[in-house]
């Protein structure tokens, strides 16, 4: 079984311009294969905000890392405490305000930043409920489908990014393996 980690970015605020919610990026010196198995979005907005149901969040691959802004380093948590530490040539962070150089977009979804609530029958409450969404699960149970992969000795990364109205915040969880 491959060594598995979860990288969790908590409370990342939305931005009116492009925003990097979470990225995993490897330098060309990286010696491990990174495979993205699952990605979750969690609407973490708890206080009442004006209903906002417009905006998109995407998953894409990048040839250069996002760099603008002041990113927050994400320390991944190993699923097995016997796993070796993540390679120092792998960077995991969130909060950048400018994307790196995009190569591919794998998925784009609409996402609402309104607080999830079921107490009223407003459209935005239905749009943001459930508050947790699995947005990438390809290749986890089906060995015929490859997960998102960053090959060893290749500079590149996978990024969860979007353009939303600057209201609310989100958590992002990325489950990945290293081999």
Sequence positions of predicted segments:
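Surface-exposed, low-hydrophobicity beta-strand/loop segments enriched in small/polar/acidic residues
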Residues: 1-179
